[in-house]
Amino acid sequence: MIDGFKTGYLPLETGKLSGRLGVALNSHRVCHSYNGLIFGFVEMVDTDTGELRYMCKLRGSVHKYVNRGAHNADAFRMSDLCRVFIQLEQNYGIKPHITPLLNVEFGVNIKLPYSPQQVIKAACLYKGFHFAPMGNIGIEYKAAAFRLKIYDKGKQCKLHEFENVLRIEIKAERNYLKKR
């Protein structure tokens, strides 16, 4: 599943977008959170036109967006992602085929018949490197271009129906994505 992402500046009509979101652009930097997505507006010089105007970046979880901001622990298929892309274009004018991605998270949820902590405790190394703790929910390996995370999804989202769900996730940075 695809989950978290962060974009570069988007070619949007920020006045219309801020109006649609109900956001007043009255300071240098404005952030607005909506159902797992965070719209970040920054007043800056547009390098294409040379004018001072608000530019917008988007980050967050497309998976949470589908669940109205509640969680990202259930199934999220490619068809769900395609529907989100259509909604983002229809509702906010965000064109997925020209949106610059700075990073993207993808992973898998695995329902286990036992606690995910058993798997987490058994995982020691990734390519000869030790994992670091991720609070009390899991472990991660940080490289320059990506992060590998293994954690207890039920513990993270604190929802009983996702008990014993192990999440294995990679957060890939732009330079990692370009290599592939």
Give residue spans per PLM region.
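Structured, helix-rich domain cores that form ligand/interaction pockets
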Residues: M1-R180
